[in-house]
Amino acid sequence: MCASFQTTEEFAALQLQGMRAAAQPTSGDEETAPGVAQTRQWFEAEPLWFKRAVFYEIHIRGFFDSNGDGYGDFRGLSEKLDYLQWLGIDCIWLLPFYESPLRDGGYDIADFYKVHHDYGTVEDVRQLIDAAHARRIRVIADLVMNHTSSDHPWFQESRSSPDNPKRDWYVWSDTYDRYQDARIIFVDTEASNWTWDPVAGQYYWHRFFSHQPDLNYDNPEVQQAMLDVLRFWLDLGLDGFRLDAVPYLYEREGTICENLPETHAFLKRVRKEIEENYPDRVLLAEANQWPADVVEYFGEDGDECQMCFHFPVMPRMFMALRREQATPIYEILDHTPPIPEHCQWGLFLRNHDELTLEMVTDEERDYMYSEYAKDPRMKLNLGIRRRLAPLLDNGRDEIELMTAILFSLPGSPVLYYGDEIAMGDNVFLGDRDGVRTPMQWSPDRNGGFSRADFAQLYAPPLMDPVYGFQAVNVEAELRTPTSLLRWMHRFIQLRKEHPVFGFGTYEPIPTSNPRIFALIRRFEDDLVLCVHNLARSAQAVELDLAAFRGRVPVELFGNSRFPAIGELPYLLTLARRGFYWFALEAPENENSNA
């Protein structure tokens, strides 16, 4: 079997010895190591794995450089799998790694079948997947279905001649006045969704950057080509895809060209392919829309994507924290429709993009800018390009509280690489690069990310006194029992011990204090009460728990038993930015009767 670590101290000792991989298997281990087929059997036995999973998003370029060229790569990621196994994550989400001119961080794909040379080879990807699977870690990857790079051979052929067989693979027009109701997404950089191409002698359609022409999904050949891409990577062992920019696949006059019926019809076709040939794989939709629109991407009875990101809940968590009011969280959850039982929301605090403010009012957006983006360089498009720790002023209590709320909500949490050690950002780097700096492994050269000369690095590591790699790194936090990293490890393990967080229902709990966010998670006979204090000061609260009278709250972290719930409101006092998670145990006589 693969090496595993019984304690944090064992892993820390190995890491501090400078070992790139935590342990090498002995000959006996090799004989008993699970094969690819056996691992896949394990995975297929748990088709709803994504409902209880903790995801971890990785920018390959910024994670670990194995060959000293200044760029993170697949072999480097493979060397760090034992760290991820120890941390407790269940699934790695990879940002785009395909061949690309990298004008948009890899979301401008020039070849769906090739790996960017900085990252390695297709064989390196296969080896990573096999090594992750051996540790019971799944791997999903971004797939950009909506568009390609303008450097893609498909587009080069399409623009070359009106008679080219691939001319109709993209959306061309003699004028730029079609689809006028469609909004411009990148308002900072694009003035139109149409761009003139002098070679083609026509305008081409793009919902994002002008160097990212949209594919024409009205062409059956395009649909088949994208299905072929999916099959290629799934056959390699990938466990699924995060479908980027999925609402924009089709265009129709008189609409905003988003969430169209034709898009859902194609997604049903994709899901049918998955169900018939890859039954344990997952599709995660990126649809930055209101929940009432996003639920359509689960499909009728869950026949489209198994998971969808819940974007609007994220800015409201930050809003609730600064306002010290739970109302924004309650309201967005109240406006979230039910989803099919075998589907799941994807939830996150931060990711590789800006903290999007598209799904808030103008007044709320101005408030968020005034609180979290006081420097104009922190703004990007309709969002804030900052990491979690700087957003929260590096407050340990705030980071723990926001993580606790995230983990308590109905959905599967997604962590962004480096947030487990409170990495900072660099607002002086352009575009979104400020939140994609190198992972900080140690206080050594380049933060332990790379042996390359500083000038060779794809981006400079952080070196300021608060967030720089000499102050914030994995090695230092492994040494410290009270570090955020060690806390995060324990917290992930705690959540995984309670299936109610992955499979349970959500019930808001009435409170006497608007600064308290309280909820019940219920799954079969398990009940967990989560109470969070959003205030900067200690708060007392009375909870209406009469429906659970007789049950005994047992605090999950310390296993402390609190007084049994009675008819009267239940009184708690929480520290500033504090929280409690309780298992509500049935009375002993009820258990004995059972």
Language-model features, listed with the residues they occupy:
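Active-site and adjacent substrate-binding regions of carbohydrate-active enzymes
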Residues: 1-594
